[in-house]
C-alpha cells in the first residue's frame, strides 16, 4: 500500500487533471480531442469526463425532489439508433426517456421502461404540483394520461404549433439539443446512458459554458 503522502499526491494529480479537462467538457470537445490537446492518454481523458458526469448526476439526483408548478410540458422520446418517422414508442433497441419541462425554468429527465400510463403517471404526480397547467402533444403517449388533477391542454401541431402559449416548444427544444449532443459519441451503451442524459439535462439547465464551468468547479471541488 502506498504511503498516505503518495495517495494525497495522486489525488491532487487527478484533481488537477479534472480541472484541466473541465473547460473542454463544457465546450463539448470530445475526450479524445481533449486528450490530444492536453497531451494525455485518451483513456485518461475519458475517465476524467466520466468523473465529471458522475458528479453532475449526483447533484441532479439530489435536486430531483423539486416539484414543478406553473405551465409545464411533459413528453417522452426514444434515444438510440435510427428509425423512420416520428418518435417511436419504445422501439426495439431504443431507450425511452420521459421529460418534464417547466416553462422558463428547468427540465427533468428520467429513463423509463416504457411510455405506458402506469409508468409515466407516477412521475407526473411526483414532479408536478396539482392544478398546474400541463401542455402535452396530442400525438404522444402523454396525451392519453389521466391528468384530471391538472389543467390539461392538448397540442395539435398542425393547428396550434405557432400559438404563443399553446405549444410544447420547450421540451421539443430539449430533445433536439440532447440528441445533437449525444450524436457525436457514436453510440452509448445502455448502462452508461443515464449519465450522458444527465449531462444533457445539465447543459440545458445551466446556460452558458462559463456558468457551467463555475458550477462544475464548485461541484468537483477544483
Residue ranges and their predicted role:
Residues 1-222:
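Residue-level recognition of single "structural anchor" positions
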Amino acid at each position: 500500500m502506498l504511503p498516505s503522502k503518495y495517495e494525497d499526491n495522486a489525488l491532487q494529480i487527478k484533481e488537477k487533471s479534472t480541472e484541466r479537462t473541465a473547460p473542454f467538457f463544457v465546450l463539448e470537445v470530445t475526450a479524445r480531442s481533449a486528450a490530444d490537446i492536453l497531451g494525455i492518454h485518451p483513456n485518461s481523458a475519458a475517465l476524467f469526463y466520466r468523473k465529471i458526469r458522475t458528479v453532475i448526476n449526483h447533484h441532479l439526483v439530489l435536486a430531483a425532489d423539486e416539484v414543478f408548478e406553473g405551465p409545464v410540458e411533459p413528453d417522452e422520446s426514444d434515444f438510440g439508433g435510427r428509425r423512420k418517422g416520428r418518435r417511436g414508442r419504445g422501439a426495439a433497441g431504443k431507450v425511452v426517456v420521459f421529460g418534464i419541462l417547466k416553462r422558463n425554468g428547468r427540465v427533468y429527465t428520467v429513463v423509463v421502461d416504457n411510455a405506458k400510463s402506469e409508468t409515466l403517471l407516477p412521475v407526473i404526480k411526483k414532479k408536478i404540483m396539482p392544478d398546474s397547467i400541463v401542455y402535452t402533444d396530442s400525438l404522444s403517449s402523454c396525451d392519453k394520461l389521466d391528468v384530471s388533477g391538472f389543467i390539461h391542454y392538448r397540442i395539435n401541431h398542425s393547428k396550434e404549433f405557432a400559438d404563443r402559449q399553446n405549444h410544447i416548444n420547450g421540451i421539443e427544444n430539449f430533445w433536439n439539443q440532447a440528441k445533437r449532443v449525444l450524436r457525436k459519441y457514436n453510440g452509448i451503451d445502455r448502462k452508461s446512458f443515464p449519465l450522458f442524459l444527465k449531462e444533457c439535462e445539465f447543459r440545458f439547465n445551466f446556460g452558458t459554458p462559463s456558468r457551467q464551468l463555475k458550477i462544475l468547479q464548485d461541484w468537483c471541488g477544483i
